[in-house]
Every structure is written in C-alpha cells, then in structure tokens.
Amino acid sequence: MITLLRRPKLGRTSCREISNKMSNTSMVVRNDRMEHRRERFRYNPETTMVIRWGCTSIVPCRNVLNTARAIQEVNDKLSFRRRMNEANVCPPSYFDTESAIEAINEGKTLVVRPGRHAQGRNLYVVHTQQELNDAIIRCDRLGTGWYAADLIHKVAEYRVFVGSGRVIWVAQKTPGNPEDVAWNVARGGRFDNVRWGDWPLKAIKTAIAAYNLTTLDFGGVDIMVDADGECYVLEINSAPSQTSPYRQECVAKYFDYVIEHGKDRIPLSEERGAWRKFIHPSLSEEAWE
C-alpha cells in the first residue's frame, strides 16, 4: 500500500488523480485526518511507502518520498534563495538593505519578497530607496525576513517537474496578463504541456542544477527565460499542481518506477543527447540511463 500524504486545501485533485493512475495500490490521506487512521496506517503490513505532497507531518513509516527536511529546505524561500544565488541559478539577489540600495542606485528595478511566500502574493516591485524601505517594512511585518532580486524581463516561463534527477514533464506558463511580474496560474493563465522534442534544454539543465541543491526526491522547478536566452530559477515547489491528465499520468509512472527500482538520483551524461539525456526512464525507452 502506497500513501500519498497531503495538507488541507493542497493537492486534493492532484493526489487523487495520480493515485488513480498508479499501477500500485495507493490511497490519499489528509494529514489533519491522519489520527483516526493512525493504527491502520502504522500497522498495515502493506504500507510500503509514504509520498509526501508538500506535507511535513510525522509519519510512522521509514520509506518516504520527499522527507520533511527536504520540503522545509525549499519552503524556506529566503534560505533557499541564498543557496541558489551562490550557485548562480537565480536572478541576482540581495539580502541586506545596503546591497539592495546599491543595486537601485545602479538603476536596477528590484522585486522584494518575504522569506516565505506563495502564489504571487506579497510581491513588491521597487524603483527607489523609499519604495524599497516601504516593501521591507511590509515584509518585516510577516516575521519571515525578506530578500530582493533584479527584475528580469522574461519572455517565457516554465515549470519543470524533476524526479530523481531527471525530467518528468515540462509545462510552459501562459499568463492571463503578460505584463504581470508574477505569471502565477492561481491568478489567471494556464500551463501548456511541452512536447519532448520542444523541451527548452538550457532551461531544463538549469532547473536540474537548482534541484541538485536540494535533498528532494521530486519537485516542480519554476524557471524563466529572458530575451537573451538566459535562464533563472525562481523557486522549487514540493507540491506542484497536476491539473493535466497527461502530467498526472507522467507522475504516476514515475512513482511506480520508484516503488520498483528505488529513488536514487540518475546522473546526467556529459554528452549531448537532446531530450533523451534528460527524460526519466519511466516515461520513454529512449531515455539515457
């Protein structure tokens, strides 16, 4: 028995449909309803794996896909942004007032965000020192710190679902309003599936580089591309929405593969191989292993 563990108001449809499409027997459990199932959950000899869908609750099972610690790593946007900034995979970022003011004095427009955020909320575009100070005050009220980053004039944005170091699916974000800074699907727009042969390989390589900074087994990497083709990772989501039947099926195949073969990361070849070197072997017989 495989258990997909989710939080209230997060991943209901995604987990249900992925579970339905898996070949292994599975069930979806909401963490706030876990107590009354605890005995069944703890002692059922058929419980072989727990798949955490953005949920860090304690579970009585050692075989877990996405540990609580790994999820916490990427949920702490401030700490993970520092790590990505050191690896040069995100927009140039600033973590103190002095460096942010220096960037503004150089003529840069900045985006300021609190240390924890979601769905495009609490995003402030600043052009002046006064606007910066106002944004920092707003973020400080939330008690999670803040960071600033260069505003990137993007021409495309993707979500790359990475599992065990390989790509499960790629979707391009089509915004409701292209002028918005945050192309968040929760605020309008949609995800369009990208065919394997059309995968943006540079963006995928950068997404995997960011994923490799984590201890996640799987996650959805949000990445944008500017007019010069430069790629910048925004964040990694430990419970990326799966509204498309195609994407649900891809993730189900990946989970089934992990159950049979284990969750070890599959390294990438240094040779050129287009999409075949990046795709997970659960999805194509042409995948490089």
Predicted regions and their residues:
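Conserved N-proximal alpha/beta basic substrate-recognition cap immediately N-terminal to
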Residues: 3-106
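Short acidic/polar capping segments at secondary-structure boundaries
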Residues: 8, 98-100, 115-119, 129-131, ...
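Glycine-rich phosphate-binding loop of ATP-grasp-fold ATP-dependent ligases
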Residues: 71, 77-80, 110-135, 156-159
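A short linear hydrophobic-aromatic micro-motif
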Residues: 92-93, 109-112, 145-148, 218-221
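Protein kinase-like catalytic core scaffold
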Residues: 110, 168-169, 219, 232-235
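Phosphate-binding site of ATP-dependent enzymes
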Residues: 124-206, 211
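A short glycine-rich, hydrophobically flanked beta-strand micro-motif that places a catalytic Asp/Glu
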Residues: 149-150, 159, 216-228
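C-terminal active-site "lid" helix and adjoining low-complexity regulatory extension at the edge
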Residues: 198, 212-216, 225-289
